[in-house]
């Protein structure tokens, strides 16, 4: 037997061990690590964890990516009543007033509110929501009985201080009456 064939035989167990180690290392890296919550959430929802995420497309166009941050795993039943945050990262430029107007339209789908509330909330959102560019983020924090606090690119923009506003605004994405049920399932973490 030549020395080269002897080395080949001796190397097989070593090779197998190396392949097993490599497979274990690669397998471990394929497990998705829990992403860190945005900095603005550290004081708002200190134990924030990513419950779910998705992407909104309209007529095939990528509009935004959205992530729902919760303190613990949340069921669909309690989605609108828990302090949590929705982070929207825009994939295209949009006008702030149009974002506010679309929000009101979607809130109407979720529940009822007066024309007085509509005018007040629309005015507040038009002040809070800037024109956005690709990569800009608007994060809404559901403060339940206090309303919703908004951050734009990590900086506090202001808040809508009305407990009735919070479940309607978050309901745009999390209510069973949402216009985007597939996106809701992705945010709740129940999508197949």
Predicted feature locations:
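N-terminal secretory signal peptides
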Residues: 1-13, 17-28
